[in-house]
A protein has these predicted regions:
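Short, polar/acidic, helix-capping and beta-turn segments at strand->helix junctions
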Residues: 1-106
Length: 106
């Protein structure tokens, strides 16, 4: 099953790619590689969601925000390539959690 068909089957609608908050592009293609700009969680109105996991943000809310970021990345990928079905392999992904120093529930 294709990636696009799977999203449709799951009823997942990808969000709009967030507008850059500085002078950068949401993606760059170099040869046959796609590089995506970093993403942070945003609400349905595009407002940046902040806070530290383990303090202002619960683990459950952090999972919800991580899902939002994942969908934003898929949306940026679709914008860059025209279809998620053009993705062959993910070579590297860096993920960061803004958490309190003693957070251990990764």
């Amino acid at each position: 099953m294709s990636a696009e068909a799977r999203l449709k089957e799951l009823g997942i609608v990808l969000p709009k790619v967030p507008d850059p908050v500085a002078n950068y592009l949401p993606y760059r293609i170099a040869g046959n590689l796609l590089f995506l700009a970093g993403q942070g969680p945003r609400d349905e109105n595009g407002k940046h969601l902040s806070g530290k996991v383990g303090a202002e943000v619960s683990v459950e809310e952090a999972y919800r925000r991580a899902r939002i970021i994942g969908l934003q990345l898929l949306s940026a990928t679709r914008m860059a390539l025209g279809s998620l079905d053009r993705v062959d392999t993910v070579v590297k992904m860096l993920c960061m959690v803004n958490a309190v120093p003693d957070f251990k529930d990764h």
